[in-house]
A protein has these predicted regions:
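Class I S-adenosyl-L-methionine-dependent methyltransferase catalytic core
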Residues: 1-178
Length: 178
C-alpha cells in the first residue's frame, strides 16, 4: 500500500496479513483523489474515514494536508495499525475504535467530507442504513459530501442524495451530497 500524493508521496506501508481488510487499490484511490483535488481546498476541510481498515484513505487525506482527519473502525488490530503507522509517519490522524453505526449516531462533530468503505458482505440494507444515518444526523455539514466505496452490484441512483457513481475495476465510488 502506498501514499499517492502530498507530503508523504510514494511512501509504502506494509500491512499485516492478519488484518480483516480489503484496502482500496492504488489505481482506484488515485482516480478518486484526482476527482476530489479539484473540489476541495485540503487545508480547509475536516474528513471522516469510516470502516477505515488499514487507514489507506486517512493517510492520503493527511498527506495532502487535510486540516482534520478522523479514522473509525471497530477492529482493534486495524485501529492499532493506523495509530502506529500515523505516529511513524508523523501524520495527525485521530483514530477511534468503535462500531461505525454507533459512532455515527453519537458523534457531535461535523465533517465536510465522509468516506466510507464498509465490508462488501454487510448487505445492501446496511449500506442504506448507513447513508440514512449520515444524512439524518449532524455528522455531515450542510454542504458536505459522502463517498461510499462498494461493489458494482449495488446501485444507489434512486437515493435522493445520490449524485453519481464511478467504476474502477471491481470498485465503485458513489457520491452523495446534502
Amino acid at each position: 500500500m502506498r501514499i499517492i500524493s502530498g507530503s508523504h508521496k510514494g511512501r509504502r506501508l506494509r500491512v499485516p496479513k492478519n488484518l480483516p481488510v480489503r484496502p482500496t487499490t492504488d489505481r482506484s484511490k488515485e482516480a478518486l483523489f484526482n476527482i476530489l483535488q479539484n473540489q476541495y481546498e485540503w487545508s480547509e476541510i475536516k474528513t471522516l474515514d469510516l470502516f477505515s481498515g488499514t487507514g489507506n484513505i486517512s493517510y492520503e487525506f493527511a498527506s495532502r494536508g487535510v486540516s482534520s482527519v478522523t479514522a473509525v473502525d471497530q477492529n482493534r488490530f486495524c485501529t492499532a495499525f493506523i495509530s502506529k503507522s500515523s505516529k511513524e509517519l508523523e501524520l495527525e490522524i485521530q483514530v477511534i475504535q468503535s462500531d461505525v453505526f454507533k459512532f455515527t449516531k453519537d458523534c457531535s462533530l461535523e465533517f465536510d467530507l465522509i468516506f466510507a468503505d464498509p465490508p462488501y458482505d454487510i448487505g445492501e440494507e446496511k449500506y442504506f442504513e448507513l447513508i440514512e444515518l449520515i444524512f439524518k444526523t449532524i455528522i455531515l455539514n450542510s454542504t458536505g459530501s459522502l463517498i461510499i466505496e462498494h461493489s458494482g452490484k449495488l446501485k444507489f441512483e434512486k437515493h435522493p442524495n445520490w449524485r453519481n457513481s464511478r467504476n474502477y475495476g471491481s470498485n465503485t465510488f458513489s457520491f452523495f451530497e446534502r
